Structures are given as C-alpha cells and as structure tokens.
Amino acid sequence: MSDVQTLIARAESLLARLEAVLPHPPAAPDWAASIAFRYRKRAGSGVLEPVRHVATIRLESLVEVAPQKERLLRNTEQFVAGHGANNVLLTGARGTGKSSLIKACLNQFASQGLRLIEVDKADLVDLPDIVDLVADRPERFIVFCDDLSFDEGE
C-alpha cells in the first residue's frame, strides 16, 4: 500500500469515528402519530416525539382574553390557509392563558393541517434543523416555546 493509500485509509477511519460521535439531524417522526410533537435531545441528537395526550382546550372555553384570542385566531386562519401570517410572541404572567391560547388554536385548526412542535428554550439553537425537517411537509407548523424568559446576562 502506498503512502497516499495509507493516508486515505486512515482519514476514512478517522471520519467514520467522528461521524459516530457527532450529532445527527433529527429523524422524521411518524407524522400521523399526533398533532403535537416535542423536540428532545437523545444521545446528543435531536428527536421529535409525538405528544400522546394533547390538551383538549377549546377557544370557546377561554375567557378574559378576547382581544388576544381574536388576533391569534385571525393570524392562524391566514397561516393554515397558506397566506402571510405574523410570528407571535405572547407575553404575560404565569397562568394568564398564553399556552392555553396556542393549544386551543392547535385544536381548532388541526383538521386543516396545523401541527405544533414544542421546543425547550435551551434547544432553540437546533431550530434550523427543525425547520429543515418540516420544510417540505404539507402541514403548517407552530414552533412553541413555553418559557422564553430571559435572565440578566442572557
């Protein structure tokens, strides 16, 4: 074996070992398993896990949030119809209905292809991989981060 062939063989061996430890892009889940998914890290790689028991919150049951509900409903209707829609940031104290509004919209529009992916704040760095995973899907996805608070220094 020549020096060049030896070098190539060693380089291929090194690459194989590196590929084994580097994180892989998330694999596609069983999209029919749920209308909601959670992004989780498993062994250094991201995975979308189906949410087995999606909250059955309905928009009609949410009170004292009429202006927010109307805006979110209108925006989500546009989004699932494939029209321009705005990104949404709901702010407020704990227990004011932010998450409930999102889950109620999911239930309202799931039959029209709306899906939800919950991502922890620490995993937002993987957002490009998640977007790549869903880019060619026919469904419309809400990326949902339930606790996006920022501490001093972040």
Language model: regions and residue ranges:
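Interdomain "pre-motor" coupling segment immediately N-terminal to P-loop NTPase/helicase cores
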Residues: 1-50
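Dynamic helix-loop-helix/coil hinge segments at AAA+ ATPase domain boundaries and subdomain interfaces
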Residues: 2-5, 47-71
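Phosphate-binding P-loop
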Residues: 51-53, 77-85
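Phosphate/oxyanion-binding active-site loops and adjacent basic polyanion-contact surfaces
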Residues: 64-69, 97-98, 123
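Pre-Walker A adenine-sensing motif
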Residues: 67-81
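Walker A/P-loop nucleotide-binding motif
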Residues: 82-104
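AAA+/P-loop NTPase substrate/partner-engagement loops
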Residues: 108-152
